[in-house]
Amino acid sequence: MDTQMQFRKNINSLRALAVISVVLFHFKIRGFEGGFVGVDIFFVISGFLMTGIIVSGLQKQSFSLLGFYASRARRIIPALLTLCTALLIFGFVYFPLDDYRELIRAIKSSLLFSSNFMFAKSGGYFDAPLHENWLLHTWSLSVEWQFYMIYPVLLMALHKMLGLHKARIALVVLALASLAASVYVTNSNPVFAFYMLPTRAWELIVGGLVFLFPLQIGKRTSLMFEGMGLTAILASILCFSEQDLWPGYLALLPVLGAALVIAANTESAFSTNRALQFSGTLSYSVYLGHWPLVVLLYTCGLLGSWPHVTAGIVLSFVLGALSYYFVESRTRKITTPPRAIFKYASLVVGVVGVSAITSSVVKDHPGIRFAYVDLGQPAYVSKLYEQECFANPYDAAECKLGKGEVSVIIFGDSHAQATAAAVQIENPQASLSWARGGCPTLQHFDMHDKELASQCHGFNADKMNRLKTSYHGVPVVLFSRASLYSDSSRGNSYRIYFPGQEHLAGQAFVDTYTAEYTRTVCSIAENHPVYIVKPIPEMPFSIYKGLNLHKRIFQSTSDISISLNAYEQRNRIAVHAIEAAAKQCNATVIDPTPYLCPNGRCIGSKGGVPLYFDDNHLVDSGNEELKGLFKQVIAPI
């Protein structure tokens, strides 16, 4: 076995392919819908290189665990620290208080290499709210760092106890176990599977196995292997999308593709291309720098603008070059492990400490910042009606809106609470609002968040029972952010499944969801007129944040909207279920899009005024746009 780790041009070109695919995916370039596989490619490369360093050192009896950690710190921390410091300053100038403190939390978790845990608690990688997090991309660095902490110790132990040959077999078993876990957990808990080391470790170990099982092949076979690997990678980029559950078994295609390219180890047009070599050299710094630019354009509503996107891509590589030549290259000169570890640990602790102090200071003294004058976040609680709310064991918003006899019942998730004002402004009497955030209007379902599932089951059962025994003949208006629950491919943190059918997906899931939703609606319709409201349009980002940042940076205001076609595509499954239930249960469908989506655009703001509290909950200004929509619900008095 070759124990000499030399610079490999084919690996450098593979790095370039990985970073280019990720950058173009994040900037929403058509044809790169599967560009997120670039991270999987990076994992394979890291596994190969780290295994080479560790095993070569063990074979020579010269491996130093301290030296290994120092080299990883020297490679990763300086550029990351530079990015975090720049964002700390940028946010100080431009961000509202809550956003700035959220950024500081992300900085701390990123520098402590625990951001994958933080983001896993916030939802799926492809969920819109996380696209506003300036350091979301550091989740992969956290996974790699955690691997770096464990892997050399594991290899040292296996090498000592089993010898190299048996250690290789043990790694094969570990890789297969991690892959099996990834396949299983991707279906049952996709958020965990995406972010966590146990379900990602196999990708890194596969890279290690390429080093441990070197191929002895000729030039022609090497070129064939490289071609097969590149074809697999390109197929992944072109054929996969964020609609696919990831990583799971699908990740085998780019992972094995990357493994083939590395194993081929041949000189070709791919490995000698100067542009790819240059991009590969800059890949880490480009990866770090591109995502904040994506978030900036995303939050300002400019990610669909070709001039801005082009500028963002170019600037990603310019900033990457600056970071590489002025940060990465210079910090590699520190070679003494204790000195390196002490230096980087001190820098990390220093920035984390400064971040924590800054967070506390700006909270108590907002006037010290340039951005302390807030443009005014809209109030979540409506001022269009009086309300009396009641305590309940479900952490739900259970309220009586207005005064007099109850003439309407509003039932659903947080969208029921957020849009209740649109119903109540038509109602001269009172409404009952029953709303529990994150709960689908279903009777028989389950969720991976067992605490939330328990509350949803209790809340729904209680309200369904009350509808059977009370308020007979009173209209019931059903609201729901239905696309959150009805599309099993999204893998968000509110994803539901059905008892005994945990792995149901595709059309089978759609059919089961539609049947369960219809059963719920028909049960209510036995005693009440039922009105089902089609989903409220969801914006791509927080309207308030977008308007605020655009105003501060560009000194101008531009209204935010999405296409009606995008709305229809997102809610296709939900609308299908609603229309099927309405037809079978003799319910009435209410469509908000003629009011919120004039001229083929669904508006998030009007005249610089947000219609939403965030990206999906209407506020008073948005509810007033719906005036007249619910007149049909209110019986004449």
Predicted regions and their residues:
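Membrane-interface helix/loop caps of multi-pass membrane proteins
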Residues: 2-337, 352
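Extracellular/periplasmic envelope-modification machinery, especially enzymes
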Residues: 242, 302-307, 317-321, 325, ...
